[in-house]
UniProtKB/Swiss-Prot annotation:
The gene is kynA. The lineage of its organism: Bacteria, Bacillati, Actinomycetota, Actinomycetes, Propionibacteriales. It comes from Nocardioides sp. (strain ATCC BAA-499 / JS614). Pathway: Amino-acid degradation; L-tryptophan degradation via kynurenine pathway; L-kynurenine from L-tryptophan: step 1/2. The keyword Heme applies. This is Tryptophan 2,3-dioxygenase. Keywords: Dioxygenase, Heme, Iron, Metal-binding, Oxidoreductase, Tryptophan catabolism.
């Protein structure tokens, strides 16, 4: 055997694949509520835990993209913001595609354990709401409607409400290029200028498109999600007491960046 060959475990024995990824803890985190165990409850739990892991990653990436844009042109990190937004888009496409896996569960199979989920609800996903706040859709009223969240989770939401959003960072970036951006009219004018001179304002245009893509993919997820819910439970109320699919449909018109959408009508 070559002296350069080292078998796994012969060096760095303190760290293994399983210990690095905390696999014992991770793989013990799926606890079924159904009794007797419903076959598809494991699938349901796994998918939602994976969503929460991706939400954590998205918060990490979107926060970093925001911070890079807050530094403006002089900060020299706008390329990094572009790169991170591209990663965000890829992850968000995975989130939409993941619904295909959940739809392999039939309504009958879901009903085998659905009643055991109440009053838990996807509405209580703190990270999902953090992501909306960070993206620009801040709504303090959500904190009043949240039930069952911990003080630490409420503190995280309060922090997101007080910190700059991705849109705030985009406006700061516009100002760093000499644009006025204190009113919707000024921002729209800046966007038109960037759109008509993409050579000079290539980074501005690229970041505006990156934000728009983020917005569009969030809309795609909402649309795909509500159709899945209607396929699964029809018009029934949600397990947390919401109106179910009718509430989800009321969220479909949400836009993080209406000025970017409106720009299309002005070109």
């Amino acid at each position: 055997m070559s002296d350069n060959f080292v078998s796994f475990g012969e060096q760095g024995a303190q760290l293994t694949y399983g210990s690095y990824l905390r696999l014992p803890q991770l793989l013990e985190a799926q606890h079924l509520e159904s009794d007797p165990p419903a076959h598809d409850e494991l699938l349901f739990i796994t998918i939602h835990q994976v969503y929460e892991l991706w939400f954590k990653q998205l918060l990490h990436e979107v926060s970093a993209a925001r911070d890079a844009m807050l530094g403006g042109e002089a900060g020299g990190r706008l390329w990094w913001a572009q790169h991170l937004l591209t990663r965000v888009h890829v992850i968000e496409r995975v989130l939409v595609q993941q619904i295909d896996v959940l739809e392999t569960m039939t309504p009958q199979e879901f009903l085998e354990f659905r009643q055991r989920l109440a009053p838990a609800s996807g509405f209580q996903s703190v990270q999902f709401r953090e992501l909306e706040f960070l993206s620009g859709a801040k709504d303090p009223a959500y904190l009043e409607r949240f039930r069952g969240i911990t003080p630490a989770e409420k503190a995280r939401l309060d922090a997101r409400l007080s910190e700059p959003t991705l849109w705030d960072a985009f406006l700061a970036m516009l100002r760093s290029f000499g644009f006025a951006a204190d009113s919707d009219a000024e921002v729209s004018a800046a966007l038109r200028t960037a759109a008509h001179d993409r050579t000079r304002y290539a980074v501005v245009w690229a970041l505006s498109e990156g934000l728009l893509q983020h917005d569009e993919l969030a809309a795609n997820w909402r649309a795909r999600h509500v159709v899945m819910v209607e396929r699964m439970i029809g018009s029934k109320s949600g397990t947390g007491g919401s109106s179910g699919s009718s509430y989800l449909r009321s969220r479909l018109p949400v836009q993080y960046y209406p000025l970017l959408w409106g720009l299309r009508s002005e070109l």
